[in-house]
């Protein structure tokens, strides 16, 4: 009986060892280009944007959190706006030149024309379908706003009037992404399907997910769509057949954390943020992956990855965590001679 129990313990240890080996199959990056930025908040941060001045930017988040930087994102100071409630959730921020917008819940839209020195509230109709969760500044007095049920509106007069871009909403969404040329992809609240829309269409086009795994997030790649599914799976649409998908990949097997967001730094270099401080990178457009293990000890889920320019990027995590891309670290690592 004692012998049997001993063998059971040995077998259990072997299983754990094999699982650990499986977890570590992803090679480590040769360098870490990310630095942890200290922030004066533990609020949930949701979006980041910079003005025409690359040193001047804003972070937004829950509990009406608004942070400002004047040194490119190394240091941030909190700003307090004169709102009727401090429980507003600032979901999205966007700038075009000196003009900026903040969209939030419930039913909040803020506008600035002086690079964020002052903000005014734009009245929204009580009949607006859903709450604003995404805003894109497109030029002087021009912006596009989307709500959490997929209603899309555009203004060309600084927010005085808004024109609906779709005839009907798509339903409650968990994620919504806009491409540079004005296309949208939205993931349903439960991740059971996704919808697409592009300028000129009257309505959203629904699509069934292509596997049994629920969709976590989606966005636009260089020549199509990318998809992150539950269980740490990543997939790209077929560049030659837009309605079809390439084979799914699972960069790191036997893990309990999920993949949450993806962003391209260059046409070939793409970063994925995940739960529990996990950060993956591919330098060949998503064919192979490496893991940045230097940030594993950061106690946060990395749920938003943003590259405003190839040398200006950020990873947003929960509990007030922010990583800043260090282009000099990357350049140094790629130019160092081999030992």
From Swiss-Prot:
Which residues are connected by disulfide bridges in this protein?
A: none
Which keywords are on file for this protein?
Lipoprotein, Membrane, Palmitate, Photosynthesis, Photosystem II, Signal, Thylakoid
The record's annotation in InterPro entries points to: PSII_CF48-like_dom, WD40/YVTN_repeat-like_dom_sf, Ycf48/Hcf136
Lipid attachment points, S-diacylglycerol cysteine kind? Answer: 23
- Kindly list the GO CC terms recorded for this protein: photosystem II; plasma membrane-derived thylakoid membrane; thylakoid lumen
**Lipid attachment, kind N-palmitoyl cysteine:** 23
Localization per record: Cellular thylakoid membrane
State the superkingdom. Answer: Bacteria
Entry's NCBIfam families? PRK13684.1
HAMAP family on file: Ycf48
Recorded domain comment? A 7-bladed beta-propeller torus, about 55 by 55 Angstroms, with a depth of about 25 Angstroms and a central pore.
- Note the subunit structure: Part of early PSII assembly complexes which includes D1 (psbA) and PsbI; not found in mature PSII. Binds to the lumenal side of PSII complexes. Interacts with YidC.
Similarity section: Belongs to the Ycf48 family.
Briefly state the protein's biological role.
A factor required for optimal assembly of photosystem II (PSII), acting in the early stages of PSII assembly. Also plays a role in replacement of photodamaged D1 (psbA). Assists YidC in synthesis of chlorophyll-binding proteins.
Q: What is this protein called?
A: Photosystem II assembly lipoprotein Ycf48
Q: Which organism is it from?
A: Trichormus variabilis (strain ATCC 29413 / PCC 7937) (Anabaena variabilis)
């Amino acid at each position: 009986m004692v012998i049997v129990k001993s063998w059971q313990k040995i077998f259990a240890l072997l299983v754990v060892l094999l699982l650990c080996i499986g977890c570590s199959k992803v090679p480590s990056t040769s360098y870490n280009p990310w630095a942890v930025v200290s922030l004066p908040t533990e609020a949930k941060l949701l979006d980041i944007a910079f003005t025409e001045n690359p040193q001047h930017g804003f972070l937004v988040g829950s509990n009406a959190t608004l942070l400002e930087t004047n040194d490119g994102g190394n240091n941030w100071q909190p700003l307090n706006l004169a709102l009727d409630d401090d429980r507003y959730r600032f979901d999205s921020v966007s700038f075009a030149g000196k003009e900026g917008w903040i969209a939030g819940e419930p039913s909040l839209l803020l506008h600035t024309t002086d690079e964020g020195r002052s903000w005014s509230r734009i009245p929204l109709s009580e009949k607006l379908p859903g709450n604003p969760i995404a805003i894109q500044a497109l030029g002087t007095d021009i912006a596009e706003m989307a709500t959490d049920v997929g209603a899309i509106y555009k203004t060309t007069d600084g927010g005085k009037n808004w024109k609906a871009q779709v005839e009907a909403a798509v339903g409650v969404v968990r994620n919504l992404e806009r491409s540079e040329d004005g296309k949208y992809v939205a993931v349903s609240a439960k991740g059971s399907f996704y919808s697409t829309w592009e300028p000129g269409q009257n309505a959203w086009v629904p699509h069934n997910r292509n596997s049994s795994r629920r969709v976590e997030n989606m966005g636009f790649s260089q020549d199509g769509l990318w998809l992150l599914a539950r269980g740490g799976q990543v997939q790209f649409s077929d560049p030659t057949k837009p309605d079809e998908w390439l084979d799914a990949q699972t960069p790191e097997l036997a893990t309990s954390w999920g993949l949450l967001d993806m962003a391209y730094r260059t046409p070939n270099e793409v970063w994925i943020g995940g739960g529990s401080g996990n950060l993956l990178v591919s330098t060949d457009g998503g064919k192979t992956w490496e893991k940045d293990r230097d940030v594993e000890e950061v106690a946060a889920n990395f749920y938003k990855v943003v590259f405003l320019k190839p040398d200006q990027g950020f990873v947003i995590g929960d509990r007030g965590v922010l990583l800043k891309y260090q282009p000099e670290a990357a350049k140094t690592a790629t130019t160092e001679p081999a030992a």
